[in-house]
Amino acid sequence: MFTPTLDARQVRAVIKELRGIDQQIVKDLRSDLRSQLAPVATQIAGAVPVDPPLSGFRNNGATGWSPVKGKVGFTPGKSRNNAKNLVAIRVDPVGGKRGLYIAELAGSRSAGSTPSGANLISVLNSRSPMNGRGGRYAYKQFRFLRPDVVKIAERILNATFAKIDRKID
């Protein structure tokens, strides 16, 4: 079976070569990745409910619920946590509220260490169950769309490599 993968180390090496050839090609690559993956980021952000999943998230404090926005980032260099991602799709709440992060990740590592935490996780699981690990809303949608993201990124990278080949020849 064929599994499409992007090796970030090879891409970083290519980008290093690109910088030596032409900065405009790197800018075009970033622009193409952002523009082509923006609809996917919007689709992932659309999987997050607008209304809070529990009444406790309906507040104006730091743990409140707020609308979310999908963003696409391009990371050609080394990341801070040694991740090997080429493209980062983030779903961030507007206004810096943390309710999404709490609801998204609650129960991903444990069943809750306090009775209130266990209750939060059980109610969230009854309303929107978490499949495996990762997340309840945005990450679940990302896992569904990941093959499309890989195909789009590969298509853009192949087009960029073809441009470089034409330029070198």
Annotate each predicted stretch with a short phrase.
Residues M1-A8, A47-D169:
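Charged, low-complexity interaction tracts
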